[in-house]
Structure formats: C-alpha cells, structure tokens
C-alpha cells in the first residue's frame, strides 16, 4: 500500500496516490506544517518551535491555538488521503510532534539525497556506469527547486541546500561524460549547470574542453567569451589564469586532452590547480577590498574637512 504513495517536494508540492493527485490537503498552513515535518522528519519538532515558525507575527497564545487547529486538520487530511497507511500517522506528544520515518520511501527528497551521497566522495575516474545511472535518476527527480513558490526562511535555507546538491550532481555528470567521451550529453548537462550558475568558471572550462574535443573549436572559443562576460557581470572579475591558459591552448590548437585512464584516482596536479584558482580569486578580492577601504578613507577625510570648515564658519 505504501508503494502507491508519492510525495513531491522538489518543484511544486504534490501528493500522489497511484496515478491520481490527492487534493485532501487543502489549506496552505496544513501544507506548510506537513512539509516542515517531512523535511525535518529525523528529529521530533517542539510545538513551541512550530507555532513560532508558522505564525511568527502572532502572539504565543494565538499561534499555539492555530497549531492545534492546523494539526487536527492535518491528521484528518492524512486519514482521508489513505487511512490504511500507518506511515502517515503522526507521533504526537504534549511537547513535540514527529512524522513516522517509514515515510522515507515515499519522498522524492530522500531518494535524491541518497543518490547524492552515493557519489559525493568519488573522483571523476572512480564513477562507474551504475553511478552514472544513479546520478541521472537523481537529476530526473529534480523537477524544480524545493517547494517552488514558497518564501519562508526555513524553506529558503533547505532550498539552497538541495540546489547545491543538484549542481554538484550536474558537475559530476559532466565529468563522467568527459571521461567517457560522451561529449554531446556532457554539453547538455553543462548547459543546465550554467543556466543555474552562470558564473561557474569550472563549468565554463568543462564546456570549453567538451566543445573542443567534440571537434568544435569555434564554440570552445565562444564559450570562453561567455565565461568572461558572465564573470564580469556577475562577480566583477576576470577569468583565472587556469581558464586563460586553456583558452590560449585551444586558440593555438595545442590543447591535449588528459589521459584519464592512465591517471591515478587522486590527481594532485588538479588539486593544486584548483587551489591556485582559489588563491588567485582571494588575491583579487583582497585587492578590491583594499581599493574600497582607501576610497572610504578618502571620503571620510573629505567629510571631516568639510565638517571642520563648517565649524570654523
């Protein structure tokens, strides 16, 4: 029976029973309470926390009353949705509330997060064909950002966490495609990654390499220009030395794709290069901060001089 239930939090919130959408959970506060309990199902949630969270603009007595009423509506709604599924029963005590953890098998966010953790620690050359399928399935689950259209603070924090995992999975899919010379698919995943993170210099480099190795040197060079524009508009910085070096190699047609199979699983040169990128960026930001500080000091000095002139006057 539980296998028939599917709860979607990635994208627009929905509850499905088999192939039919369940409309029994109607009011927004009931939905908010359910979704919060689902997202934070690993720990009991105190009534006080829930009442403050969902009715922060109301006095404690009123917010606690609202919680009791909403909780009652949620219980009724869950019972109407599928009365024979014990996983949808709430564990309710005088001070805390928790939804049964066996609900995990019904949640898209659980499957997505499990897939992410299966591959998170693996280098590109360690990713297997099974890992590739796992990542593709996880990406397919990501039908949109978490609870699209919701703007509560707790929701925004969780949304950003899932966005980060999604981008990391896309990055690994691009890496896998590069290693296995599946350039067209790698470019498709890279395009989606840049659609969501336009200023990802790493993704731009991946796209430059993929275009070049696919035999499209012109697009590889265009990709550098897109990277340069994105970094300038989004961050106000120039491409890093690593990106410029790649561009120059592609422009002179001297770029040599790495022999992925021959390399060890832990490529110290890549780690050093990535570290150099970070150091370079920190140096750029340090210079920017120094300029800003000098500008502020000049402005403060001008204000002090003006103040002194006014006092004398």
Walk through the language-model features, giving the residues of each.
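Canonical positions in the second alpha-helix
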Residues: 192-193, 227
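Hydrophobic positions within repeat-based interaction scaffolds
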Residues: 155, 228-259
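Intrinsically disordered, low-complexity protein-interaction/activation regions
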Residues: 1-188, 226, 254-313
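TPR/TPR-like (Sel1-like) alpha-helical repeat modules
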Residues: 139, 212-236
């Amino acid at each position: 029976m539980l296998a028939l239930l599917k709860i979607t939090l990635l994208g627009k919130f929905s509850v499905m029973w088999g192939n039919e959408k369940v409309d029994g959970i109607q009011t927004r506060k009931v939905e908010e309470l359910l979704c919060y309990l689902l997202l934070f199902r690993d720990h009991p949630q105190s009534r006080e926390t829930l009442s403050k969270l969902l009715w922060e603009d109301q006095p404690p007595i009123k917010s606690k009353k609202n919680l009791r009423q909403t909780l009652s509506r949620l219980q009724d709604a869950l019972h109407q949705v599928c009365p024979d599924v014990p996983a949808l029963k709430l564990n309710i005590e005088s001070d805390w509330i928790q939804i049964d953890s066996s609900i995990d098998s019904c949640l898209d966010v659980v499957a997505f997060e499990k897939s992410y953790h299966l591959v998170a620690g693996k280098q590109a050359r360690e990713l297997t064909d099974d890992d590739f399928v796992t990542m593709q399935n996880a990406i397919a689950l990501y039908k949109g950002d978490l609870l699209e259209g919701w703007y509560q603070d707790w929701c925004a924090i969780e949304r950003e966490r899932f966005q980060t995992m999604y981008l990391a999975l896309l990055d690994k899919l691009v890496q896998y495609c590069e290693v296995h010379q599946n350039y067209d698919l790698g470019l498709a995943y890279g395009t989606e990654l840049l659609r969501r993170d336009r200023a990802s210099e790493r993704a731009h480099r991946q796209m430059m390499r993929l275009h070049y190795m696919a035999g499209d040197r012109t697009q590889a060079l265009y990709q550098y220009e897109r990277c340069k524009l994105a970094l300038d508009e989004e961050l106000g910085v120039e491409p890093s030395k690593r990106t410029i070096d790649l561009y120059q190699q592609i422009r002179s047609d001297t770029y040599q794709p790495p022999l992925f199979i021959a390399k060890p699983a832990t490529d110290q040169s890549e780690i050093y290069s990535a570290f150099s990128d970070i150091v370079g960026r920190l140096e750029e930001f340090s210079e920017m901060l120094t300029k800003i500080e000098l500008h502020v000091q000049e402005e403060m000095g001008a204000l002090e001089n003006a103040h002194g002139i006014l006092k004398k006057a």
